[in-house]
Structures are given as C-alpha cells and as structure tokens.
Amino acid sequence: MHLPNSQIYKNFGESMNPFDIMKASQIACCLEVSSFKPGNVHRNRDYRDIKYHHFINAGIAFGNVVYEAAQKDRDVGLYIKKAVIESKKWSPTNANLGIIMLHIPIAMAAGKLENFDENKLKENLKKIAENTTVEDALNVYDAINIAMAYVNKPKKGPDVTSEDAKKELIEKGLTLLDVYKISAEWDNISKEWVDNFKISFEGYNLLKKYYDELNNINLAVTKTFLNLLAKYPDTLIARKRGFETALKVSKMAEDVLNNFKEEKVKEFDKYLSKEGNKLNPGTTADLIASSLMIFILDRIDKRETILW
C-alpha cells in the first residue's frame, strides 16, 4: 500500500530531531556536489587531487558529529574539529571544511527548534556565534590544519599556519567570532558567521523559488549557485587569483544566469575549469551546501522530503 509522505511521518517524532538534522546535512552535501555548478567537481567532473566520490564520502562521514552537535548549545569549535577529523578519513585533501564550518552551527541552532522557523533559526545562530570562546577558536585552528585547507598569510590577526597562532589567540583572548570578524574581510565563510548567515538564508530562499518554478532540484541548485556567484565574488578565487579575477567571474555568472541555457552553463564550466581548480568557485559551493541544509530542514518540517 502506498502512503503519502504526511502519513508516513505521523509515526515519527518531532521533525527537528537530531537524526533529521543529520540527514539534512548529509543530503545537502550529496546534492551540492552532484548538481552542476560551473567550475566545481560534480558528477561529470573530477579534479586531479580530489574526485566526486571523495566529496560524497566525506559529506556523509561527519554525519555522526552533526547528530551530536544538534543536541548541544556550546563547544561549536570542538564539533567543527571532530567533523573535520571524520571527513578527512575519507578524502585525500580538504573536501568540506567550509561546509562543516556552516553545517555545525546550523545543526546546533536547528536542534533548539520544535519546528522549522527561519527567524528563530537566525536568532539561534546569532546566539551561537556570540557565545563562542577562545577554546572554540583554538579548535577551529586545529580543524583548518587537519583539513590542509588553502589559506594565505592573513593581512592581520593570528596566522593559522604559524606555530605561535594559538598562543596569540590565548594571549589576546580572541573568541571564534573575534577571529571570524578579522577573516571576514577576505573570506565569505567567516563573513557568514559575522552577518548571521545572510548568504545561506538568501540561497535557501532562492532554492525555494527556483524549485517551485522548475520542479528540478539540480536545476534549482545551478541557478542558485549562479545567482550567488554573480552577487558575491568568490573569495577562494580572490585568494588564489586576485579580486579582479573574482569580479570578472561574477560578471560572467550574471551573464549566464540572464541567458540561462544548457550550452551557456557548460561553456562557463569549461572556462572555469581550463586551469584545473585555479578558478574553482569553492566558497560559493560551500554556501550552496549551507543553503541546501536549511532548505532540506524546511522540507523535512513540511513532510515534503521527495525532491525531483
């Protein structure tokens, strides 16, 4: 007998339970990497040093930490570090540090909700950021080094690659939010923490809009990706190739979005990938993953978990 989703869910507990939050994170990771996002690894493209299946594996692997974090309201840095350790077991290089930095606080914030509520989720995220500690910052510095993430020497603030960085954090009493306020100048993941996940929620609302229009989650992700990339120059590209190059890529994304056709998207993808991953809009991909997690949490709450 076929039951509608609403009937199936009646036997389940509250929609914002830790298992659902874990599943939202894992499914978001899988949808993010599987959808066609120009310049990124996707189901039809690997990079030399990291392949499509590494992202799938790594995105699923830290689910147990998301489950734990969803039941906590402190130690966000510790759970980011634990998630990176789990993820790194399944990937030869950094697959999802940025995603983890976004998914763990979202999980903790969602864990305090009885039902999905965008405004309450924002309030909870704000509290998590404001209550971070020096210990959280120390753990995130460890996480970055474990992940072997691409980082430049910062213009100011402690250098995560320096042996004295953690000592400087302690001496100056810098919390994780303090550190993110410094790095927000050149990193949009850090800026999300400072701006209360503004881009992630913008992406969530774009996903809703495009999915309602297209009834195709992969196309909805592609259009959301292009929209965010057009509006917010990718900070990974900026760190690798300079801000002017990042601006140029954003302008190209806007042109593709305004003339949204399969061949245009593929041409853009070919252009961005012609130098390996030098023009990889990886920060924007991470923001898609956080937008997707929020989108899926909303769908779980509405008992609308089947996506086309």
From Swiss-Prot:
GO terms for molecular function: ATP binding; triphosphoribosyl-dephospho-CoA synthase activity. InterPro entries: CitG. Disulfide bonds: none annotated. Gene3D superfamilies: Triphosphoribosyl-dephospho-CoA protein (1.10.4200.10). Pfam families: CitG (PF01874). This is Uncharacterized protein MJ0227. It comes from Methanocaldococcus jannaschii (strain ATCC 43067 / DSM 2661 / JAL-1 / JCM 10045 / NBRC 100440). The lineage of its organism: Archaea, Methanobacteriati, Methanobacteriota, Methanomada group, Methanococci.
